[in-house]
């Protein structure tokens, strides 16, 4: 069960970061309302707070988080941007998630 909690927390953290970066991108690249910067800032603050909830050292958290970020970013690419994922996208995400699992699920010293 702990593994699922860690994976969910990584996915939620990645989503908060992606939303926090995507909204300013809409403002700057697609001339959307500057009001989108407010929820973007809140989302990035949520992202920073969520990072503090991870149960391991910050550097290890960031390293493991990167794998989940890749997978969530590709899901965003498919769902929000409507792009078709390639086998290279899927294979790369699988490799990144395997790396995340090695780092995040390593035995903890007693």
From Swiss-Prot:
Database matches in Pfam families: UPF0060
Keyword Transmembrane helix: yes
Localization, UniProt: Cell inner membrane
InterPro entries recorded: UPF0060
Keyword set, alphabetical order: Cell inner membrane, Cell membrane, Membrane, Plasmid, Transmembrane, Transmembrane helix
Topological category with respect to the lipid bilayer: Multi-pass membrane protein
SUPFAM superfamilies: Multidrug resistance efflux transporter EmrE
Family membership noted in the UniProt record: Belongs to the UPF0060 family.
Protein name: UPF0060 membrane protein RSp1275
Organism per entry: Ralstonia nicotianae (strain ATCC BAA-1114 / GMI1000) (Ralstonia solanacearum)
